[in-house]
């Protein structure tokens, strides 16, 4: 074994790249470390292309092993199962910037597997995973236009911080991940606490500048450890076929893209393509129909892009900075705790909000430690939203990613547990889609939360920006359609308030996106965001003054912490009886805080009354309504409070002489008793005759 090792300082940590020892049968394997966080990245590519595919078959699998954190998995089988949400999100984070760096026409299957084998609880594994992936692809010999760098940027006390630790991130107003090559930014993913556009853009620039040390180090690593580049050449286009397709379809395609309604437009585009294809097959039965399909797709792309660059109206007739028509409704469903219907053009989200107790919060046990998530946002994209049929079931990677982006957009304005002691689940059902459904989910979530009475700090809106760039000419598009996303050069999603940005996601497909272009996009997005917020505020401008009548109302009381065991009871018998008999949900904290949740106010009052009885202290001199629970020769034992009994001595039953207790009292008889004394051992002495005298005096 001849290991090749490259180490360099990166921010607060030392990064080490090593190859030549582990997983030597893969095309490339790199053991990448940042501090004590270590990942094994392997790359395998098939040497033969699958020409039947019309896409690049790249798979990125990211897996966290519990042994990396010195843990044994839970569950019956005691081994890792399907990918967690965090694993899915990091796999997408790695996939997005590397995919554009493979050459057009490359159809060989490539699989990247990232395995976290050691983790420092202060160093997230995502950045080193991206660096390790870039290094492995660089040395694999597979055609790849890297190296790629990656950085996390924080913002604390007005200064940017490179690759902050977990503890530092907790106090940071920004958590931004940026990836790019030496020349260009390719991907941004971020969450922020309503920061200004210039701060966000500065963070992107700072992260890209700082990660050049990674790009340079991987280039040196490749020079020492790289395998020979594959003998692959891009497929050459048949220029005669290109010209023929242009002659047959360009005019029809141009006319089809004058149709503003998506479904009608798609039908006409399909007609144009089918006619051109039929004409080509009639002329030459041996023509490669797959190549024809690809060239028709390229023609379609050129038609749309050339119109936009020429300054002509967009597909649906809008100018570059125009927003589609908005229709905003709050409170659209009768029994949900909060709901909204947000429609922007042909994109629509039906969003619901459900309130629950602390017990309903999501418990997450990852290799980075345990955490509780009180605010959950789930995004669903059913096939009918785009007029198609398809499988319905567990959420796909895209749905998980879009839900997390919307969550990031809202998280900065959510109330604390002290301000609003509820768990909150939002579900965004995309009922129509033609571009930027994740940003529609942000808008719909803001509305649904307000409708549910959740005291969010302010409204939040989201907008998706696009870009078409040819040479030095470029056009930034506001509120892009699905076609403009697919055919454009950039997908730039921004969520935020009137005061600043709360989430920013950017995916760039080309090099040459300058700081000027990003600045224009951010400023244009700000104007669009404010316009949408103004329309949203007309539907509901602030949270409702009260929660839904159908939502559980949480009432908080305090008891003596020493009394908690009395409320719980032996084996949980007391609290179980309380919840079952009152129909409430009861949660107890070690400090004596008791939270009672119920949508029925009377049930809550009854639960409070019974808890107060259980935890009440016996007061000397007070008269209680008691029940006879045991009769003995020298008196009777009376229950005066739950778990609190006292003795009425035979001499305290009546003013008259009592020879036989049973002549005056019987089991389960209700009697009034006065507390005469509580001794040091907690024994309670009661009197019936004193109680009668006190009642008579009153």
Curated annotation (Swiss-Prot):
Gene: pnp
Classification via NCBIfam families: polynuc_phos (TIGR03591), PRK11824.1 (NF008805)
Single annotated GO MF: 3'-5'-RNA exonuclease activity
Family statement: Belongs to the polyribonucleotide nucleotidyltransferase family.
Binding site for Mg(2+): 485, 491
HAMAP family per record: PNPase
Role: Involved in mRNA degradation. Catalyzes the phosphorolysis of single-stranded polyribonucleotides processively in the 3'- to 5'-direction.
Pfam families noted in UniProt: KH_1, PNPase, RNase_PH, RNase_PH_C, S1
Residue span, KH domain: 552-611
Ranges of residues in domain S1 motif: 621-689
Subunit structure as annotated in this protein's UniProt entry: Component of the RNA degradosome, which is a multiprotein complex involved in RNA processing and mRNA degradation.
Protein name, entry field: Polyribonucleotide nucleotidyltransferase
Claim: Nucleotidyltransferase is one of the keywords in the record: yes
